Amino acid sequence: MASDIREKIIDASWELFHEKGFGETTINDIINKADISKGTFYYYFRSKDNLLDTLSEILDREYERLSKEEPEGMGAFDKLMWANYEVHEFIQQNIDYRLFAYLYSAQIIKETGSSLLDRNRYYFRYLERIMEEGRRSGEFTDIMSLREMVKFFSMGERALITEWCMNNGNFDLGEYSRKLFPVMMKGLKR
């Protein structure tokens, strides 16, 4: 029950951030959209800024959804490219590029760890599972450890998102990823 309320707040917040922008969204907007009391909001979050740290949860939910929809008979590399495209489409449609730019810059100057880089995230387990499949089938190289492969992949994804942010979201992130990411990740293949 408690996690349902927290998720409801997170979902309402990110919808509003996308619709109105982060700066224009108030805590009262979030409270009204989530249909909760002010006390309930503050029970789960100290401020609106704390909601930015939930982006990793939003993205992990999307990866969990995708893991249930993986196309049959697809090799590991193609599965990774498919998931990358799908998530980047999701990002473009649901998350303002300025929020990513803000989050990335905040993580660079912040002394505490990033929830986006938390190795316990579903995202990293998902990538590792697929890469392990690819390694077992002989599709992926063995010159890097699985951990290095996952890191390489996630760095590539962040590079594309950073490029999108630096261009003010002025290109189709999904299509850009579909075209460039396989070229960037070719080094994973045997």
Indicate residue ranges for each PLM-predicted region:
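Alpha-helical DNA-contacting segments of helix-turn-helix folds
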Residues: L51-L59
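Basic, helix-initiating cap at the start of DNA-binding domains
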Residues: M1-K20, E24-I36, D49-N50
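C-terminal peripheral helix-coil segments that are non-catalytic and often amphipathic
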Residues: E86-E89, R125, R129-S137, S154-M155, ...
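Short coil/turn segments at alpha/beta junctions that flank glycine-rich nucleotide-binding fingerprints
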Residues: E19-G23, G73, N94, S137
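Hydrophobic alpha-helical connector segments
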Residues: T54, K68-N94, L146-F153, G174
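Short secondary-structure transition hinges
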Residues: E89-E128, E139, E148
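Short hydrophobic/aromatic patch on the recognition helix
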Residues: D35-F45
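All-alpha amphipathic helical-bundle segments outside canonical DNA-binding/catalytic cores
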Residues: L117-N120, R136-F152, D172-E175
